Amino acid sequence: MIFTVTLNTAIDHIIEVEGTLTRKANNKTKNVIYDIGGKAIHVSVALSYMNIPNKATGIVGGKMGQLMVELAEKKGVDCHFFEQENCETRESIILLDQSGQGSYMITQRGFVLSRSSIQKIRDFLFDNVQKDDIVVFSGTPPQGFDIKDYKDLLMVVKEKGARLIADTTKEYLQTALTCHPTLVKPNEFEFQEFIQRELHTIDDYVNALKEMSDLAEMWVVSLGKKGSIAK
């Protein structure tokens, strides 16, 4: 079984306006869409689309949290999310116009997870994950999430004999690597930040990844339009 863990759930609120978005003007909407946000849940959506069994877990709150679960279930995701009372799943507001110059993105921080919520995730992983399962932690945890709690969740997975995949950044990436994950997937900027030097060519990345081979079984570094490099 594949499990995905979304610690900072989100709803993408996509607003498309007519013409070009203009300051100090009445920009009329052409279309408004609500969609699932959060990296890990997107993994579950992709797996479900390919009819690959998986379970998605995490913490949601309020009407936006309920909407996120409903949208995920409509896409075939087997959801096992827990609700934190008096909190609201964050919105990522995406503004699109017809200029062809890209979008504007305004992202809320998300709510602080309670001790009870963190324990629910831990208990779910402990009770359900089995040897050789795959558990995906993708995205950055919400504000105030203690690095010790993050490592504790990862270690539950490792102690169960499951395969750990981490797609995160900064201190959370560093912590994931102390658990010797099966795979990590930073982007080019996150990877350069981690190794504390700039990389310019494919050979630069290949040589840097050779230095990191003891930290994870597999590395995939996404390079934007240039594709990805894996080791």
What do the predicted segments below correspond to?
Residues M1-T57, G65-L67:
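Glycine-rich phosphate/adenosyl-contacting loop at the front of the ribokinase-like
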Residues Y49-D133:
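Conserved N-terminal subdomain of the carbohydrate kinase-like
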Residues M105-T107, D132-T140, D167, K185-E190:
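Short beta-strands and strand-loop turn motifs
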Residues K148-K231:
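Conserved phosphate/ATP/ADP-binding segment of small-molecule kinases
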